[in-house]
Amino acid sequence: MNAPVKPSNLIKGATGDWEMVIGLEVHAQVTSNAKLFSGASTAFGGEPNSHVSLVDAAMPGMLPVINEECVRQAVRTGLGLNAQINLRSVFDRKNYFYPDLPQGYQISQYKSPIVGEGEIVVDLADGASIAVGIERLHLEQDAGKSLHDQHADMSAIDLNRSGVALMEIVSKPDLRSSEQAKAYVTKLRTILRYLGTCDGDMEKGSLRADVNVSVRRPGAALGTRCEIKNVNSIRFIGQAIEHEARRQIGILEDGGSIDQETRLFDPDKGETRAMRSKEEAHDYRYFPDPDLLPLEFSQGFVEALKADLPELPDQKKTRFIGDFGLTPYDAAVLVGEHESANFYEAVLAGLANGRRDGKLAANWVINELFGRLNKESRGIAASPVSASQLAAIVDLIGEETISGKIAKDLFEIVWTEGGDPRTLVEARGMKQVTDMGAIEKAVDDIVAANPDKAAQVRAKPQMIGWFVGQVMKASGGKANPQAVNDLLKTKLGL
């Protein structure tokens, strides 16, 4: 039975509503110093053909030897995706011709992948979450790269990437909108980065996606899908899906039919174009690679890797909510990038009372620090304010040495000039005024100077904020806001 379709996920066509059905095949480059079947370097950015072994170049007589680290990374990824780990898997030859595939086949896994079914939970922008099924994860070789801009009348081949280990992570067709697809890839990339199994750098090609899109009437049978190859940014994934769905709907509403085909996305034009008819599995003539024995390992091997897994985003989010009272939204923002979560934890480690001030620290990390970093297009690694400096600012607020307003001024000074926050507060006279006599005098002066406003506040107590603001202004932001508020209530008889 089909689940009801959310109205927000429907596309309005000329003849009625349509639903997208989306599945993704994400190719993640394994973090490893050597390639899947050779000892050649995987370093990015080398001179063309400078990281190529005889195995990678498919020289006669060269035999592949499995890199155990790549196997470990694939198993760790499978565990991070809550997936079934298969203790026996088989490498197959996927036969096709392409100039940057020197063997004439790709070593992949077909019927017996290293990782089976799993699931990840994806948080959406509207606060809802969806479970996306993982169909499988298998190991395979990457191909080389064709370069078409080196010569006017010929193409060049760079085999540096040839033989680099890829994990192909295949989702089930559980996604129903471009926003869901983008959120899924974002969450998957975050998990991979936490695990350290792929750096997720889409600009360098470390993570790229084949996007399968079909459309149907709500509740109808699945339509014919088209595959959009090698989409290399999350923004482009969303654009490619939107265009492809509209293209298919236009054809169907004009009485046509969808051809199952492979397409390419042109980011400059924001459209997809036909590349070739979509191959079926039998077109590749898969058969087990005779040069490689089946890959077998014990449950103990899996358990040892499982015991060594880091805390993953969902676990960290739950801990942040439970230990520090963060909202689910704030916790999700902090764990969304590994570096962000690490920075927040470093701030917590520097606090005098992390459990008490964890929520305050989160507010400062998200609103002040991230806000400023985004404004200046900086990554967290380039932050002028360190975790220890931000922790000191939060401590000064928590112990009521400075007010929130003064804290923002202090943050600006540390951002632009650097320095120890406590030393700066002392040197620049930024301490909060806690002398009740001085605060009371300021309150009396403001109330006496504004009798009409005082009468209005007595009639409408919620207007007391105006008086609080005036007293804070008169004190240069140094008065204790709570003390000001309490004194005003007493003086005004509220």
From Swiss-Prot:
Enzyme class, first EC level, given as a word: ligase
Catalytic activity from the UniProt record: L-glutamyl-tRNA(Gln) + L-glutamine + ATP + H2O = L-glutaminyl-tRNA(Gln) + L-glutamate + ADP + phosphate + H(+); L-aspartyl-tRNA(Asn) + L-glutamine + ATP + H2O = L-asparaginyl-tRNA(Asn) + L-glutamate + ADP + phosphate + 2 H(+)
Membrane-spanning parts: none
Gene3D superfamilies from the UniProt entry: 1.10.10.410, GatB domain, N-terminal subdomain
Top-level taxon: Bacteria
Keywords annotated in UniProt: ATP-binding, Ligase, Nucleotide-binding, Protein biosynthesis
Pfam family of the protein (one): GatB_N
EC numbers, comma separated: 6.3.5.-
Gene Ontology molecular functions: asparaginyl-tRNA synthase (glutamine-hydrolyzing) activity; ATP binding; glutaminyl-tRNA synthase (glutamine-hydrolyzing) activity
NCBIfam families the UniProt entry points to: gatB, PRK05477.1-2, PRK05477.1-4, PRK05477.1-5
Subunit structure of this chain's protein: Heterotrimer of A, B and C subunits.
HAMAP family found in the cross-reference section: GatB
Stated role: Allows the formation of correctly charged Asn-tRNA(Asn) or Gln-tRNA(Gln) through the transamidation of misacylated Asp-tRNA(Asn) or Glu-tRNA(Gln) in organisms which lack either or both of asparaginyl-tRNA or glutaminyl-tRNA synthetases. The reaction takes place in the presence of glutamine and ATP through an activated phospho-Asp-tRNA(Asn) or phospho-Glu-tRNA(Gln).
Similarity comment: Belongs to the GatB/GatE family. GatB subfamily.
Protein name, entry field: Aspartyl/glutamyl-tRNA(Asn/Gln) amidotransferase subunit B
Species of the source: Nitrobacter hamburgensis (strain DSM 10229 / NCIMB 13809 / X14)
Name of the gene this protein is made from: gatB
